[in-house]
Amino acid sequence: LETLDVLPTATILTIGAVKFDPFGDDINEKKCEKFYVRVDVDSCDRIGASVSQSTIEWWGNQSQAAQDEAFGLENRISIEDAMAQLYKFCWGAKRVWSHGAGFDVTILEWYFRKIGKAIPWSFWEVRDTRTIFDIGINPNRPPVLAHHALEDAWNQAVGVQNVYKTLRTSTTYNGGFIQPFANQR
């Protein structure tokens, strides 16, 4: 997500997501199912979404390319249409990953509730990339345009796959292979 606030009620500028298998390594070529929409901020305002001055100022310090993508006027759709499309995209996913446990998912869940749509995941299916990147394994994330919702989603998915791959090929103190998340697949 790219937003105009950091609260769960934040106005959404763009939504980006990718489908990926954390146990795979096929996402490195950017060959994955993608979701990307630019949201009409007026539609967010109509349902009571928030904007913060500090976030607007923060955007002023980001790259021109990121600002152009986040604030460009072309191809914007209503938040209701964006959430309906995201619902379909996420339906049936075994896990939902976000970059921070308390940001993207809480904002999206607020919108799903606000527009009267079911949340397409359960609380136990939510995963956090920041936590996995913090365990001390280099995620080898490729360079992308920072603060572009789709580019960031792809970058984070590659990082998750790289960390999982490293864990799967690591050995324990007695020489056995680590079997992360064996019953979670």
Mark where each language-model region is:
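Short, flexible loop segments at boundaries between secondary-structure elements
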Residues: P120-N140
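Conserved non-catalytic scaffold segment of RNase H-like nuclease domains
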Residues: L1-S98
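Short, function-defining helix-loop hinge/capping sites that tune catalysis or transport
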Residues: P8-A10, G136, V160
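Acidic, Mg2+-coordinating catalytic module of metal-dependent nucleases/exonucleases
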Residues: R95-G102, T106-I107, N138-R185
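Substrate-recognition/cap helix-loop segment adjacent to the acidic, metal-dependent catalytic center
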Residues: Y87-C90, G102-F123
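Generic detector of well-ordered alpha-helical packing
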Residues: L1-T3, V105, T129, A153
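Gly/Ser/Thr-rich active-site cleft segment
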Residues: E109, I115, R127-I132, L150
